Amino acid sequence: VLDDDRLKQGKTIFGVDYFRELLERVRSIRASERRIWQKITDIYAECCIDYDKNSPTTHDFYAMIQNRFHYAITGQTAAEIIYHKADHTKEHMGLTTWKNSPDGRILKSDVSIAKNYLQEKEIRQLERAVTSYFDYIEIQIERQNAFTMEQFAASVNKFLTFNDYRILPDKGRISAAQAKAKAEQEYDIFNRTQPIDSDFDKQIKGMLE
């Protein structure tokens, strides 16, 4: 994470410059167009002084970060949300939003995204929780607190506990593969009767009215 040139210039690894630059990087990531989970993992990679992409700690952090926040808000992991809410008998298959919403066609890729099933209130709560977590990390950097991978991974539950959110006790009862299979099975049934309203259809309909 640290630039080799900085070390050659003789600057202290954890000096003021390190934390100032780290804070700038974190804020740049926050302002980017990356998805929220990508932002968290990007910040993890930037902040951890012993970062190793192949570490079991890193793999576990990347695999569980989304679930920790989903569980904090809904009491379910991402896979559990998808598995229990994907239903071909419901309007829009149970989705509250999708790539082409509100009037566009629902695609198979839409039905395996947990956030697409959340109510507007839950989405606001989720985004607010993640934003507050980013603020918490910035405060730690401003106080010149460095993170190891273990410390950064632990900071998530530390933050959630302090703010009285639910804490995910395990890896959940439904796997990502099970959730995806169930959602796609429901989609295949739903898609048979999904209305198609193309520009051509609209033009013909307008001519007939």
Please provide the spans of the model-predicted regions.
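Positively charged, phosphate-engaging catalytic surfaces used for nucleic-acid and nucleotide handling
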Residues: 1-209
